[in-house]
Amino acid sequence: MTCLSAARSGHLEVLKWARQHDCPWSSSTCAFAAAGGHLEVLKWAREHHGPWDSATCFFAAAGGHLDVLRWAREHGCDWDELTCAYAAGGGHLEVLQWVREHHCPWDEGTSDHAAAAGHLEVLRWAREHHCPWSRSTCHRAAMGGHLEVLQWAREHNCPWDAGQCASVADEQGHAEVAQWVRAPAP
């Protein structure tokens, strides 16, 4: 836990001390450093054979830490669809654009995360670039109370289950969303 806490907080000297005293670490150490945008901590961990995995990239993306993400990719860190999804969920359009320029895969999770967090600009960009979406995209927008996102998604033919969207909006206290979903179509 000491290595994780040090990495998450960006305390390189604490991490060095912990490793000198045989404190165990895992791929989460690098992922937590990336999540906090602590590039120097990440570099040190990798120089000392700290393990990493795709979580390093998706946590860097979630935090909008493009410098960390670039460095990780330049040094061979794997990534997957969650990198795009977490960038979208964090509202980090510049990061999402960069990862797609560098051929990071995506799936409907990118649209879902953008909708869940109310990031309409990110969702628009993703759809303009042919990112898939599903009924879950509308469901997540309704759950988050993001009426503008839900309206835009429906105007652009995103599939949905109106009953589920209304129910989840009610459950989450988003009366305006539930009313809009239940309103008769013009």
Regions found by a protein language model. Give the residues of each.
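Ankyrin repeat (ANK) tandem alpha-helical domains that serve as protein-protein interaction scaffolds
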Residues: M1-P186
